[in-house]
Amino acid sequence: MSTSSLRPSERVLLQRVRNQLIDYLEIAASFEAQRDFQTQAPETHVATEVLEQWADWVSSNWREELKTPTFSEQERNAITLFQSVWQDTHNTLVRPLPALDYIQLAPAWQQLRVAAEDCLRVFMLRGKLSDVEEAIG
């Protein structure tokens, strides 16, 4: 068997990225999940992780990268809306970011949480896709 046949297809790789976005949104959309993350990883600055992880998965060229049919048009629209709020939040908050308990009081952080919740709701219409096989449709 050649090594090229072991490499996942582009679609499967995009499905994995999509699943990672769902994981991210589940944390960004929930103050409780953020606090749980902080408890489980006390050495991690969760506010920074929540703010910066989005950029790890969604580049400035995301419209060309996060393609249909892996990402539905509804999901792409939800990303556009969340990206706008994320960018505003990213540009508004002071650095270094305060501790999680304090940043959760900030209006910009609260708006980010609501936007993440809205985006997640759209993604969960289809839920997570396979990490190993191409999803149909």
Language-model region placement:
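Positions within ordered alpha-helical repeat solenoids
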Residues: 30, 88-91, 122-125
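Intrinsic low-complexity, intrinsically disordered or marginally ordered coil/linker segments
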Residues: 1-3, 131, 137
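Short terminal alpha-helical segments
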Residues: 1-61
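Short, flexible helix-adjacent loops and helix caps
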Residues: 33-37, 94, 98-101, 128
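Amphipathic protein-protein interaction modules
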Residues: 58-118
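Structured alpha-helical bundle/scaffold domains in large eukaryotic membrane-trafficking regulators
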Residues: 94, 124-135
